[in-house]
Amino acid sequence: IGTEYGLQRPKESLFHRNFMGMCDNARRKTSAVFGGLSMLYEFCAENFERVPAAIDAGARRIELCDNLAVGGTTPSAGVISATVSYAHEHDARVMCMIRPRGGDFHYNQDELRMMEMDLGLAVSAGVDGLVFGCCKPCAGGWALDELTLGALVMAAGCATEECKREPIDITFHMAFDQLSPEAQLDAIDTLADCGITRILTHGGAAGTPIEDNLEHLSRLIECAGDRLTILPGGGISTANRDTVAAALGVSELHGTKIVPLEV
């Protein structure tokens, strides 16, 4: 894992010059097109309860998890099966969270085995992709845990082969935000080399307004290029999704409030 790519740091984006103008012209509707790109809204669902309403409101992809109060954990087999069945009947896809507990993203061998078993069950239930992330302590901060990452990617590949399925999507979730900004740029190389499809990221510390993180998100998007997709999430709602998408030039957004739902 971790082939070197000779990373070049992208230049700072100038999107802030017209961002406020975009805010004034934001359109609040279920689907949108920016620069010829059709938008895909990924709804973060805690269990099945709000999945039908979210799909009806325009979500074309579901990130399915449990326990959002701790950032999301692996949902039950029954919830996965019901969600996959409903989503596929309504032209939507399902990404399943694989996370054995709340807290940090540093997993021991027992937890790794649990994750491997859970992702196997999810793949056999027909999910379209998996969502996981792993970090390890490093010099007072966090670094990408390449060994655990490699084991999970390999387990996902084995599971799809056993089910005679095509390779599925893998999203590296917001564990990515535990890395320093510069380490994130370096981690993109490793994640792309491992075959990760997309990175879900807020672009900054949890709780900060997404608008404060747009410049760094722009750097990540430039660095990733066409190797993988940067999926902005956290603090994006129907109120600001159009302006965020237009400012970053992305075609996918993630959130619990990304489509209009009744409270």
Language-model regions: role of each:
Residues 41-43, 62-64, 94-98, 130-132, ...:
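Hydrophobic faces of well-ordered beta-strands that scaffold small-molecule active sites
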Residues 45-49, 66-68, 100-102, 134-138, ...:
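Active-site-proximal loop/turn and secondary-structure-junction residues that shape catalytic pockets
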